[in-house]
From Swiss-Prot:
SUPFAM superfamilies registered for this protein in UniProt: Ribosomal proteins S24e, L23 and L15e
A single cellular component GO annotation: ribosome
Organism: Heliobacterium modesticaldum (strain ATCC 51547 / Ice1)
Gene: rplW
Protein name (Swiss-Prot/TrEMBL): Large ribosomal subunit protein uL23
Quaternary structure annotation from Swiss-Prot or TrEMBL: Part of the 50S ribosomal subunit. Contacts protein L29, and trigger factor when it is bound to the ribosome.
Gene3D superfamilies: 3.30.70.330
InterPro entries in the cross-refs: Nucleotide-bd_a/b_plait_sf (IPR012677), Ribosomal_uL23-like (IPR013025), Ribosomal_uL23/eL15/eS24_sf (IPR012678), Ribosomal_uL23_CS (IPR001014)
HAMAP family for this protein: Ribosomal_uL23_B (MF_01369_B)
Gene Ontology molecular function: rRNA binding; structural constituent of ribosome
Keyword Ribonucleoprotein: yes
Highest taxon above the source species: Bacteria
Amino acid sequence: MRSPYDVLKKPVITERSMDLAQENKYTFVVEPKANKIEIKHAVEQLFNVKVLDVHTMNVKGKPKRMGKYAGRTADKKKAIVTLKEGDKIEIFEGV
């Protein structure tokens, strides 16, 4: 099993994720090979909260160009984690 620090890469700070945070749902970019059980354990260990549900999605990279060179941004996996009523993650509070 992976370390919690390897599973969760960074939080997603967008207008939509801030609206979801009001509903006790927090969004993270996670390791692409991580499954829902690993994501749940990582969030519970790192933030001392109770996770009720985990939704994941794979996001394809966007095509980008740099002059004549074409490429793509990297693919990534996002997870939306629903917490128990009354629990919250402090890193989302001050944004």
